[in-house]
Amino acid sequence: MVRLAPAEGLISVDDHVIEPPTVWVDRAARADRDRVPHVVEEDGVSVWRYGDKRITLPSLFAQAGRDEADIMPGLMSYSDMRPAYFDAAARTEDMDTDGIVASLCFPTIPRYCGQTFLEAKDRELALECVKAYNDWTIDEWAGGAPGRFIPLIITPLWDPALAAAEVERCAGRGAKAVSFSENPAKLGLPSLHHRAGYWDPLLSTINDTGLPICIHFGSSSMVPTTADDAPIFVSALLSPLNLTYAAADWLFSRKLERFPNLKICLSEGGIGWMPYIIERAEYVVEHMRWARTFEPFDYDNTRYENLGPAVPPSDLFRRHIYGCFIDDRFGVENLDAIGADHVMMESDYPHGDGTFPNSLANAERLLAGVDAGARHQIMQGNARRVFRLEEPQWASSKTS
């Protein structure tokens, strides 16, 4: 195991934690312990029970440290898992091996932006579950290894006022980022374009706190495919493109103009598509000027409303949107068209797309032709700025 000095390693802005079995039970009133998410063992498999949900843990969610030849679809119990999947101290040991100095982790049982609790029938209990998860990720996951984890919180998406209050509460307790859906409309919620400003209470609070918004592909609970009988490779190929849709929504929602401190981090979407989207957005605005003043497909010219962005989309993109990637050679080769100051890296631990135990080596390989200043920005400087991270206080040492 090699312990790196902070300046020598990589900050990963997209990893994952499989919550320990006691996260919600430990924080629930005794009468509610069988109503909050809890684990039961069924035929050698750990099953999370919550309301009418039965949530299992596919082995494909957790492949770090396993030989490729041993990876097959199946279900896991906690006894099968590498402790680093759910234990902070063990995770930091794997991070040291991997060259990761700090890590932002998305949840598993709540799903990427808290969809599990959005779908719950008992909203009062669901709110308590959201708060319990956030307290755990701040106090125990991040608190168990100060400086090593970037606390990412979820919100009660069904009520923007409650969500805003939870962001404010958690910001005061040390949260560093807020998870949000790539497309809330697919979750049965209003879109970013909602004319009455459904999301404004939440976005206003995020704007005021300065917390970045992290959006992971799959956070709309929608898996893209072309046909019911298309092979899984089609969905795997297309999934990152969900974030191109998210970028389009943010660019044309007017939210980035109304809330100028927003920072949108697109997790696991890669960066190679960004130059085209920036160029295409400019082209669309230039060649569809009529759309600035008319409702879509409404040609009654007595109804005027400025629907177009007041700021060029390319400027909005470069001010507010950050690309995150694991392995994107084309994107790195086109950094000049994106901006090295708006790109961050991921290890995706412990998922199958991840690079453990070679994340640092992977980054150094990809960035070998990038100048030293930009390389440092991408490997950790941008993350320190966006998430307002202090330098870790742990000392550098190397052991074998």
Predicted features and spans:
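Mid-to-C-terminal alpha-helical segments outside catalytic/metal-binding sites
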Residues: M1-I11, E19-G74, S79-T97, V101-A102, ...
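Histidine-centered catalytic micro-motifs
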Residues: I11-I18, I213-G218
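Conserved residues at the C-terminal ends of beta-strands
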Residues: V13, E19, F106, S181
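Surface-exposed, active-site-proximal loop segments in enzymatic domains
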Residues: D70-M76, R111-L125, A161
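Substrate-binding cleft and catalytic face of glycoside hydrolase catalytic domains
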Residues: C105-E119, G144-R148, A163
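Short glycine-enriched loops at secondary-structure junctions
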Residues: F106-R111, F217-M222, Y349-G352
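Short glycine/proline- and charge-enriched loop/turn segments
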Residues: F117-D122, D228-L238, S359-E364
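Catalytic pocket-lining loop regions of alpha/beta-barrel enzymes
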Residues: L125-A126, A142, G147-I150, T155, ...
